[in-house]
Amino acid sequence: TLIKEWADRDIYSRIDYRKIFRPEMKTTVQELKRRGYTVALVSSTGPKLISRIVEEVGMRPEFDLIVSGKQFKQSKPNPEIYHYTADTLGIREDECFVVEDSTVGIEAAYRAGMSIAGLKDDRFGFDQSKADYHIDSISDILKYL
């Protein structure tokens, strides 16, 4: 609805994503690319907000594919978003390594048959028990790949 769209726009327009951006994200993604990995950004967030964020933090060129959950009928924990991403990139699900922090994101990747690193985030008390690995920082994934 128009009211919800306006409320969402107002909330997110006030956030300076450069201030909350994880600084190791860019160097980690660049290292993954240097090692020959394909890197996708898969988010439940809407495409306009994803676009704004990756532009603000200067990461758009780093991703081979950017996927929004708004492209699908069902959101996470439905694994469709991850199946679509793997298929689009021509990669088998069991060859994918996903970094997730939320319970529903981890469940979606688990149901898609992907390896999962649960990124620690103490703010929300997410259940990360289905993650294969537990990491404190994005850069920790480099130890596993």
Predicted features along the sequence, with ranges:
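Short, basic/glycine-rich phosphate-binding loops at helix/coil junctions
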Residues: 2-11, 63-64
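Generic alpha-helical structural signal
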Residues: 4-8, 26, 51, 83
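Short, acidic loop-to-helix structural element flanking the phosphoryl-transfer center
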Residues: 13-41, 47, 51
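Alpha-helix C-capping/helix-to-loop hinge sites
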Residues: 10-14, 69-70
